[in-house]
Amino acid sequence: MEFVKLQCNICFSVAEIKNYFMQPIDRLTMIPVLELDTCKHQLCSMCIRKIRKRKKTPCPLCRVESLHFNVYSINRNVVDVIKCSVTSVAQWNKINGNFDAASLASVLFEKSLLDDAEDSNNAANSDDTMLSESQAILKKLQADIAEQTQLNIKRQLDLNKLQQTSVFMQEKLHRIKNDYNNMHKSFKELQLKRISTEKALKSLNDDYAKLAAKNARLSNENKVLSNKNIELIKHKNLLQNEYTTLQSYKCITNSTITTNVTINVD
């Protein structure tokens, strides 16, 4: 990325940051957008100063109050974070006109100025250094590409293995599903058989109850008939005794009559 544009979330001021990664000399970069320490939302220094209330700055996006803000400074591979109090932001100028940032920097930091000629000489003298660094970067990129290629091959092998495992699991799942369907079908059949058996058993129980009731009725009738039979036997015996008595009486009577007739004849 050659450059990036940052924008304040409140006043929408824009700052552009250029990339000096391939330059052989150190490049100092201060990110102009500031970060509130508590909620991490980004504002410009002017907005922080204007919305500050006493020693705190309420974030206009989330209303969280912050006592400090962070400034980020970049120097090649080193990133420094500067934690500042919100009360340390103050307006420096008192005029209404716009400033030329380069002219202002040349005035404020005159002792740190680096002229273009010296910068060009340093750049010319460092061509070999830049070439060697570029070659080192190229070798590193080639090594990274080779490592990434090996990693991609390994991942492809792992992916193929996972695909085979997935196919095996799908086949196993299909078999399990078929077994489940067959078991469900068998369960339905057994359930229907159970219902039929329960109906048949209920019918048998009903028939048994009817037969038991009929048997009880017949037993009662048999008991009544048995009692009647006993009464009839008793009555028969009584009649038999009376008949025997009558027969005996008849024999005695006949014998008496015969005796009387014999006497009369004589």
From Swiss-Prot:
Membrane-crossing residue ranges in chain numbering: none
Keywords assigned: Host nucleus, Metal-binding, Zinc, Zinc-finger
Start and end residues, zinc fingers (RING-type): 8-63
Keyword Aminoacyl-tRNA synthetase: no
GO cellular component annotations of the record: host cell nucleus
Gene3D superfamilies to which the protein is assigned, alphabetical: Zinc/RING finger domain, C3HC4 (zinc finger)
Protein name according to UniProt: Zinc finger protein CG30
Organism in which the protein naturally occurs: Bombyx mori nuclear polyhedrosis virus (BmNPV)
Lineage of producing organism: Viruses, Viruses incertae sedis, Naldaviricetes, Lefavirales, Baculoviridae
Gene name tied to this protein: CG30
